[in-house]
Protein backbone atom coordinates (compact mmCIF):
# COMPACT_ATOMS: atom_id res chain seq x y z
CA UNK A 1 0.00 0.00 0.00
CA UNK A 2 1.39 3.38 -0.96
CA UNK A 3 -0.48 5.95 1.09
CA UNK A 4 1.29 9.15 0.03
CA UNK A 5 0.96 10.29 3.65
CA UNK A 6 4.07 12.41 4.11
CA UNK A 7 4.79 15.39 6.36
CA UNK A 8 8.06 17.34 6.19
CA UNK A 9 9.19 19.92 8.73
CA UNK A 10 12.35 21.86 9.46
CA UNK A 11 14.30 20.41 12.37
CA UNK A 12 16.98 21.82 14.62
CA UNK A 13 19.01 19.33 16.60
CA UNK A 14 21.47 16.49 16.16
CA UNK A 15 21.16 12.86 15.04
CA UNK A 16 23.58 9.98 15.45
CA UNK A 17 24.70 7.68 12.66
CA UNK A 18 27.17 5.03 13.75
CA UNK A 19 29.71 6.74 15.99
CA UNK A 20 29.17 10.21 14.52
CA UNK A 21 26.64 12.94 15.16
CA UNK A 22 25.39 15.29 12.45
CA UNK A 23 23.22 18.43 12.54
CA UNK A 24 19.61 18.11 11.40
CA UNK A 25 17.88 20.23 8.80
CA UNK A 26 14.58 18.37 8.35
CA UNK A 27 12.37 15.65 9.77
CA UNK A 28 10.09 13.55 7.59
CA UNK A 29 7.09 11.63 8.94
CA UNK A 30 5.37 9.13 6.64
CA UNK A 31 2.90 6.25 6.80
CA UNK A 32 3.65 3.43 4.38
CA UNK A 33 4.70 -0.22 4.23
CA UNK A 34 7.83 -1.09 6.19
CA UNK A 35 11.10 -1.25 4.29
CA UNK A 36 13.22 -2.83 7.02
CA UNK A 37 11.08 -3.83 10.01
CA UNK A 38 9.21 -7.11 9.75
CA UNK A 39 5.91 -5.24 10.15
CA UNK A 40 2.99 -4.23 7.96
CA UNK A 41 2.37 -0.54 7.48
CA UNK A 42 4.43 1.72 9.72
CA UNK A 43 5.02 5.30 10.71
CA UNK A 44 8.47 6.19 9.42
CA UNK A 45 10.53 8.96 10.99
CA UNK A 46 13.52 10.22 9.02
CA UNK A 47 15.84 12.78 10.53
CA UNK A 48 18.04 14.23 7.79
CA UNK A 49 20.49 16.93 6.81
CA UNK A 50 19.67 17.94 3.25
CA UNK A 51 23.06 19.61 2.67
CA UNK A 52 25.21 16.68 3.71
CA UNK A 53 25.70 13.43 1.80
CA UNK A 54 22.66 11.14 1.36
CA UNK A 55 23.81 9.02 4.30
CA UNK A 56 23.19 11.91 6.72
CA UNK A 57 19.98 10.26 7.84
CA UNK A 58 18.64 8.51 10.90
CA UNK A 59 15.52 6.49 10.12
CA UNK A 60 12.99 4.76 12.37
CA UNK A 61 10.03 2.50 11.55
CA UNK A 62 7.30 2.23 14.21
CA UNK A 63 3.96 0.48 14.41
CA UNK A 64 1.02 2.88 14.42
CA UNK A 65 0.31 2.00 18.08
CA UNK A 66 3.93 2.64 19.10
CA UNK A 67 3.87 5.96 17.22
CA UNK A 68 0.72 6.96 19.14
CA UNK A 69 2.40 6.06 22.45
CA UNK A 70 5.47 8.05 21.41
CA UNK A 71 3.28 11.04 20.52
CA UNK A 72 1.63 10.87 23.97
CA UNK A 73 5.04 10.67 25.67
CA UNK A 74 6.26 13.64 23.61
CA UNK A 75 3.14 15.62 24.55
CA UNK A 76 3.77 14.94 28.26
CA UNK A 77 7.47 15.80 28.04
CA UNK A 78 6.78 18.99 26.05
CA UNK A 79 4.10 20.10 28.53
CA UNK A 80 6.53 19.54 31.42
CA UNK A 81 9.30 21.38 29.54
CA UNK A 82 6.96 24.32 28.80
CA UNK A 83 6.11 24.47 32.51
CA UNK A 84 9.79 24.29 33.44
CA UNK A 85 10.67 27.09 31.03
CA UNK A 86 7.82 29.33 32.21
CA UNK A 87 7.77 28.60 35.92
CA UNK A 88 11.37 27.89 36.81
CA UNK A 89 13.29 29.87 34.22
CA UNK A 90 10.77 32.68 33.73
CA UNK A 91 10.57 32.24 29.96
CA UNK A 92 7.21 32.78 28.29
CA UNK A 93 3.82 32.83 29.88
CA UNK A 94 3.02 30.41 32.65
CA UNK A 95 0.61 27.65 31.59
CA UNK A 96 -3.00 28.24 32.50
CA UNK A 97 -4.89 25.46 34.26
CA UNK A 98 -8.60 25.47 33.50
CA UNK A 99 -10.80 23.77 36.06
CA UNK A 100 -14.17 22.34 35.10
CA UNK A 101 -17.17 23.77 36.92
Residue ranges and their predicted role:
Residues 1-101:
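Positively charged, low-complexity terminal tracts
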Amino acid sequence: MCTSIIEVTKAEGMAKRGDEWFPLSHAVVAYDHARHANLGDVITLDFINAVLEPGARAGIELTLETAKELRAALDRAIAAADFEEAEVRGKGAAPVIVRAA
